[in-house]
Structure formats: structure tokens, C-alpha cells
Regions:
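Short glycine-rich, Thr/Ser-proximal phosphate-binding strand/loop in the N-terminal lobe
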Residues: 2-40, 44, 73
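Short glycine-aspartate micro-motif
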Residues: 3-7, 51-55, 100, 124-128
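Conserved A3 ("GATE") glycine/threonine-rich loop of ANL adenylate-forming enzymes
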Residues: 11-12, 107, 131-133
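Short glycine-rich anion-binding loops that position phosphate/pyrophosphate groups of nucleotides
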Residues: 59-62, 130-132
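Glycine-rich phosphate-binding loop and adjoining helix at the ATP-binding site
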Residues: 62-123
Length: 138
């Protein structure tokens, strides 16, 4: 099974294709620019790759509430051009596959809990230091 992943970071996007074992089969990164240019790079990477599902971890703030009318949006970010951008809408318009959306920190912590150093542990802490400092507790 081929799975797609996007780390939508404030300075760069990392896109990859992996499998259910957590193995990375293909990976690329590019600078975060205006949404149109950045998403063009995302689409260029994934088009024709026949991925079966896609996970997105994004810089924020975001709206991850499935019941919200702005689910899938990057909301009140100071990042130029990205304020109230419907990133999941753009992806769903292009790809008819199951998708998940959360913060970049939650995505990274979930990856560590599922495939990384926290796999099999009852508890773990994930600390990220960037524009802000976030501590994630499992």
C-alpha cells in the first residue's frame, strides 16, 4: 500500500510516499512559498503516484475539527498568503482518497509513537522548538 504524507512547514514543505511499515519510498522538499506555487509542487510530486491515502501535518493555526465549516483550513497564520487557506479542500479537489489533517507537531509525534522511538511505549514526550515551543504528551 502506497501512502502519501505532507509536512506543511512554515519554511518548507516535505512530501513523501511510504508504506504501512513506515518505510519511506520517495521524498522531496521545497520552500514554502505562496499557496499556488507550493501546492503546484505538491501536486507535481503526487500526481500519477497512485497513493491510497494521504496524511497532512500543517503549520498553524489550523482547524482540525471535522464538524467545522473551516475544517482543513490554515486559519489565522501570519504566513503571507496562507491566512484562511483551505489546504484540504485543494487536496480533496485533486485526489479522491482518504485523508487526515492535523498540526505538524501532532503528525510528527504520531509518527514517533507509531514507527519511531516511542513505538510500543506506554508514555512519551515530544518537544518541538520552532517559531513556538510545543510539548506533546502520550
Amino acid at each position: 500500500m502506497k501512502l502519501g504524507a505532507i509536512e506543511a512547514g512554515g519554511t518548507k514543505f516535505v512530501v513523501c510516499i511510504g508504506n504501512e511499515k513506515g518505510e519511506v519510498l520517495e521524498r522531496e522538499s521545497f520552500p514554502t512559498e505562496a499557496p499556488e506555487k507550493t501546492m503546484e509542487n505538491v501536486f507535481k510530486f503526487f500526481d500519477g503516484k497512485e497513493i491510497e491515502a494521504l496524511g497532512v501535518g500543517s503549520f498553524g493555526p489550523i482547524d482540525p475539527d471535522l464538524t467545522s465549516p473551516t475544517y482543513g483550513y490554515i486559519t489565522t497564520t501570519p504566513k503571507p498568503g496562507w491566512n484562511n487557506y483551505n489546504i484540504m479542500g485543494a487536496l480533496k479537489e485533486r485526489y479522491d482518497i482518504p485523508m487526515a489533517f492535523d498540526t505538524d507537531v501532532n503528525g510528527a509525534a504520531l509518527g514517533e509513537a507509531t514507527f519511531g522511538v516511542a513505538k510500543g511505549l506506554d508514555s512519551a514526550l515530544y518537544l518541538t522548538i520552532g517559531t513556538i515551543i510545543i510539548l506533546w504528551v502520550l
